[in-house]
Amino acid sequence: MGAINVTPDSFSDGDRFFQTENAIKQGELLASEGADLLDVGGESTRPFSDPVPLEEELRRVIPVVSELAKRTPIPISIDTCKAEVARAALDVGATIINDISGLRFDPQMVELAAAANVPLVLMHMQGTPRSMQVEPHYGSLFSEIIAFLEERIQFACAGGVSRERIIVDPGIGFGKTVNHNLLLIKHLDALATLGLPILLGTSRKSFIGEVLDKEVTEREPGTWATVCAGIIQGAHIIRAHEVATCRQLADMTDAIMNA
């Protein structure tokens, strides 16, 4: 999953892809490098970030989704917590909803996901982007995350979403300490009890920088290590900002595991 941040304040890309044409070109590049799908988002969810107004988020992402749906043959995911943004993106060619709130922030999202009958990513997050990194803590890390995801799955299904359409994401970096993130990757297979595909997003995140003492622009090798470990532990989808190397890493890791 190639990530495209159409924001002026992405923790990873800054404002490199804030301009519509730059974001479209990046999507085409990621597709050419071997991405199986693209994930377009217009609201930064870095720690302590504020929500983006609806009209601004629409202005950022809809032209990008629309053009990429025409120019690339791969599925496009809309990364949003707002039902109106998701609906508009689906109308112009998106075929996946990636809701980092796990359907918690917009009560209309579950109805939309059910009616659209498209794949839906449900992510774990402790708190909100603004508060999630204020002393995150757990009594039992895996028990609490699995219980959260199962409750969100049940909520989605009660709202009409088919369970077989759901993908789960443990939310690396969303309300977790460095050690929480490392443990989640190390024991990612614990989420297999949910019986659903697992999406893992570690690309360039701050825990890598803290372990390696590297700035965001120097975190690709650390990202690659997490990709390999995640695949070995059962990740089905890897969300990445740099696809070319991750594509090779994923394919080689799969080949070794399936030999």
Where are these regions (language model features)?
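Glycine-rich phosphate/adenosyl-contacting loop at the front of the ribokinase-like
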Residues: 1
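Catalytic domains of carbohydrate-active enzymes, especially glycoside hydrolases
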Residues: 25-41, 234
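Short acidic capping loops at alpha-helix termini that bridge into adjacent secondary structure
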Residues: 162-165
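Active-site-adjacent loop and "lid" segments of alpha/beta metabolic enzymes
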Residues: 11-26, 45-75, 80-84, 90-91, ...
